[in-house]
Amino acid sequence: MEEEGYQWARRCGNNAVEDPFVYEPPLFFLPQDQHHMHGLMPNEDFIANKFVTSTLYSGPRIQDIANALALVEPLTHPVREISKSTVPLLERSTLSKVDRYTLKVKNNSNGMCDDGYKWRKYGQKSIKNSPNPRSYYKCTNPICNAKKQVERSIDESNTYIITYEGFHFHYTYPFFLPDKTRQWPNKKTKIHKHNAQDMNKKSQTQEESKEAQLGELTNQNHPVNKAQENTPANLEEGLFFPVDQCRPQQGLLEDVVAPAMKNIPTRDSVLTAS
């Protein structure tokens, strides 16, 4: 049989190798015993078709896929039912564990310490078996849904129990939006120096003016000054007119006024008369 195969390959050459379906391949050369051939391979057409299909396409057939789906499909329904029932529970558990946490914070002398965010109070509620009410706050940032609940502890009066819900989607305000009223420390010191100098000057001038006014008032109200004012010379000056005023005036009034009315007493005449 080996010699016949060698002769067949010699006669056919490379064409038998390139196109095995034109010439009968050597794989189908069976022994000459027909009984043995029929015993081993009862259906030549089935084997040939199987060989051809195996050489053309080696992947799964449609019937194989249909059989596989028929076997697997009944098991998918309970899995889907379980997934629908368990997903909401998983989501709730993750939300309750991750998005909600509680802290205990001690207040200082200025009140409750600031956490860096701005909050708006939107409600208050009394709690059962607790004298301290619970306050509800919400973040003022419009893109943020964070909330918190503040409650004073029953055991410690200087401790707050804060429960946060959700997360902040922005930075804290002292670093993200600085206050407009705040200024840099160097500028503040310079401004304070100038203001202090101006205030010192104004205060000094005001004090000097007040001291001068007080000094004048004390000098006027001093008993020595009052005694000097009440001397006879000062009293005479108040009673009598000065000599210059008593001199006759040159003009037309001399022709009208009588001479007797011109004799106005003066200090010199009084002294001489006395």
UniProtKB/Swiss-Prot annotation:
Keywords: Coiled coil, DNA-binding, Nucleus, Transcription, Transcription regulation
Basic and acidic residues: compositionally biased ranges: 195-213
Pfam families xref list: WRKY
Polar residues bias locations: 216-228
GO cellular component, one term: nucleus
Sample GO molecular function, one term: transcription cis-regulatory region binding
Record PROSITE patterns: WRKY (PS50811)
Residues annotated to bind DNA: 108-173
Subcellular location(s) of the protein: Nucleus
Disordered: region residues: 188-228
Coiled-coil segments: 193-222
Protein's UniProt keywords contain Metal-binding: no
Family: Belongs to the WRKY group II-c family.
Function of the protein: Transcription factor. Interacts specifically with the W box (5'-(T)TGAC[CT]-3'), a frequently occurring elicitor-responsive cis-acting element.
Record protein name field: Probable WRKY transcription factor 49
Organism: Arabidopsis thaliana
Gene that specifies this protein: WRKY49
